[in-house]
């Protein structure tokens, strides 16, 4: 399964990343997930903040810091999902921190 990640930026002394995976390929995925996360220095774990994926049969957005919120359905392709989190990562990092 192809995947990649890149640094989105820094917020409140945390470095945020966007990771993306697609199966079977980036240009025609049957399944995909694009995740915003940071690495927690103390716990040495990756903390997922937000994710766009199609794991429930439709493309949706999960704000992982608000587990009780329903999934937000979105009409995005894989590459649009990557662009969405790349452009808006700071909004979700801030919401996660507040």
Language-model segments: residues:
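Negatively charged, low-complexity tracts enriched in Asp/Glu with abundant Ser/Thr
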Residues: 1-42
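Small/flexible residues
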Residues: 9, 14-16, 23, 53, ...
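A short, structured beta-strand/loop element
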Residues: 28-68
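Acidic, low-complexity intrinsically disordered segments
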Residues: 62-98
């Amino acid at each position: 399964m192809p995947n990649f990640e890149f640094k989105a930026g820094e917020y409140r002394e945390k470095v945020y990343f966007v990771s993306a995976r697609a199966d079977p390929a980036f240009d025609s995925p049957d399944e995909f997930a694009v995740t915003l996360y940071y690495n927690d220095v103390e716990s040495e774990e990756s903390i997922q903040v937000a994710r766009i994926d199609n794991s429930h049969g439709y493309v949706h957005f999960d704000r992982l810091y608000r587990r009780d919120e329903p999934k937000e359905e979105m009409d995005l392709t894989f590459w649009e999902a990557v662009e969405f989190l790349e452009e808006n990562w700071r909004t979700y990092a801030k919401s996660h921190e507040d």
